[in-house]
Amino acid sequence: AKITIANDSSNMARCLKILEAAGLIELNELPSSLSATDVNNYIKTNLKNLNITPVATNMIAASLNDENNYLGLVNATFAIAAGLTSKELLCQEADPEHVNANILACRADNKDSNKIKDLVEALTTEETATFINNHFKGTIIPYFVKLV
């Protein structure tokens, strides 16, 4: 059975760990940086003889339309954009503490800019949090921390 996973290093590691947690594969120790061309080298045992195929992250949801593709491990942002809902969810990351954060960053010489301050203020409002909660329906959680 063909399964599509992300072809970038960090998301590929996440996908492989999900497949391992689901009991479909056993992994070797993963290196700090993964390569799509080496995906089979990361797998110690392929318990279900899966054809694990790395593709561009933004193409995984579309790969589900391929009758030869058994399943795909889709990031929440792309799943939502493709109209997938929790009804299609078969498994998810086992670690509830796993967090992928988006960071607003600027050059040091711009940190005191009024435009940057206005942007930070706009992005960290209760209105923005409500929009994220309503739009992403719990798949993305707003959490605002000012680091500097």
Predicted features along the sequence, with ranges:
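Periplasmic-binding protein-like
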Residues: A13-E20, L123-F144
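Short loop->beta-strand "edge-of-pocket" segments that line small-molecule binding or catalytic clefts
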Residues: A1-M12, G23-N28
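Short beta-strand->loop
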Residues: N51-T53, Y70, T85-E97
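A bilobed periplasmic-binding-protein/Venus flytrap-type ligand-binding module shared by bacterial periplasmic
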Residues: N100-N114
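Alpha-to-beta junction loops
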Residues: A1, L24, L47-L50, D66-V74
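Short helix-initiation/N-cap motifs at beta->coil->alpha
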Residues: S32-A62
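Solvent-exposed loop/turn segments at secondary-structure junctions
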Residues: S9-M12, N58-I60, T77-A81, N110-K111
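A ligand-binding cleft/hinge motif common to bilobed small-molecule-binding domains
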Residues: A61-E88
